[in-house]
């Protein structure tokens, strides 16, 4: 920090120079973490003057931009499978609270598309985050399973990064859907628990899908940067504050996939960063592909 002693000349209300703050190294900054630095006026040399307390401290927000890769699932038949039958500290067959999160970019929600559904993640006829709509009315986010389904208030964009989430809160007996951290719908759901090991029409050995649901053409047709499964009911504030990254060891985080690279020992596997062992296996045709230059947060003009 430079210029920490400033002079306000007689008859003026601001100094001719300002305090200069420079970040000389990012080595100790955690990826995806936002930092807030308070800068305060310690005192003034003229004892006849006082500092307005409400203006004594300003807060500088240091928001890092992550530039990474994302899995390219834009072609038909490209998706991931996850086997949640493996034992961990979480009872994945009977979770009383659940949150799914994904940061995705749909690529084929176009006027020529004949599809009604683009899948995000989950379990068909159980707890499945997907879209529902048409090329005339657009596609909304939908949480299906545990009838009735919830549709989002707003239509989803094509070819833009969006953060999508659904929540089951067993204590309230409700389910919720969010787009970019904004609540888009809620309904009662008194099922009691969510089973991550079962889905209708999906692989019994790996029932949880990312980028597909059921057994027909409901593929995502887009990019996926991150996806997470929690054993807690995340709030809107939680969702907004951790779009780009979260500590893999956070309590309640069942599985966390960053789709920026394959596992070292298997080019078709994306590792679960929590250490719980719920790796995502590419089930599509051909090789797993990636797109580069993915920014988060993405504030560029589209």
Task: Please give the residue ranges for each predicted region.
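Extracellular/lumenal carbohydrate-interaction signature centered on repeated Trp-anchored short motifs
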Residues: 84-100, 153-162, 217-223, 248-250
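Extracellular glycan-recognition modules
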Residues: 67-140, 234, 238
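Extracellular glycan-interaction surfaces
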Residues: 63-75, 103-109, 130-194, 286-301
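Extracytoplasmic low-complexity segments
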Residues: 54-75, 245-302
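Short boundary segments that mark the start of a structured unit
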Residues: 1-68
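Extracellular glycan-interaction patches encoded by glycine-rich segments
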Residues: 200-225, 237-244, 302
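Acidic glycine-/aspartate-rich tracts in secreted/extracellular proteins
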Residues: 26-27, 44-46, 106-110, 170-172, ...
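Extracellular, beta-strand-rich glycan-interacting domains
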Residues: 98-108, 218-242, 254-264
């Amino acid at each position: 920090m430079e210029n920490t002693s400033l002079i306000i000349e007689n008859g003026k209300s601001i100094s001719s120079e300002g305090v200069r703050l420079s970040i000389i190294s990012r080595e100790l900054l955690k990826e995806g973490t936002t930092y807030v630095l308070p800068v305060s006026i310690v005192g003034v040399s003229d004892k006849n003057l006082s500092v307005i307390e409400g203006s004594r401290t300003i807060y500088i927000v240091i928001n890092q931009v992550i530039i990474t890769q994302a899995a390219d699932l834009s072609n038909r038949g490209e998706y991931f499978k996850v086997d949640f039958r493996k034992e961990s500290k979480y009872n994945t067959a009977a979770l009383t609270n659940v949150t799914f999160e994904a940061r995705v970019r749909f690529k084929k929600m176009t006027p020529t598309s004949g599809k009604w559904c683009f899948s995000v993640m989950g379990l068909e006829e159980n707890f499945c985050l997907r879209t529902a709509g048409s090329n005339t009315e657009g596609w909304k986010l939908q949480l299906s399973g545990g009838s009735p389904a919830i549709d989002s208030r707003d239509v989803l964009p094509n070819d833009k990064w969006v953060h999508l989430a659904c929540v089951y809160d067993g204590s309230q007996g409700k389910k919720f859907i969010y787009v970019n951290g904004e609540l888009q719908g809620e309904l009662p759901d008194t099922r009691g628990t969510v089973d991550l090991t079962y889905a209708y029409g999906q692989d019994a050995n790996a029932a949880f899908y990312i980028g597909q649901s059921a057994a027909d053409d409901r593929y995502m047709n887009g990019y996926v940067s991150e996806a997470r499964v929690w054993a807690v009911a995340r709030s809107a504030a939680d969702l907004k504050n951790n779009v780009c990254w979260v500590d893999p060891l956070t309590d309640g985080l069942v599985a966390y996939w960053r789709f920026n690279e394959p596992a070292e020992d298997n080019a078709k596997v994306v590792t679960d960063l929590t250490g719980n062992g719920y790796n995502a296996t590419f089930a599509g045709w051909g090789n797993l592909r990636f797109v580069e230059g993915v920014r988060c947060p993405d504030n560029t003009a589209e």
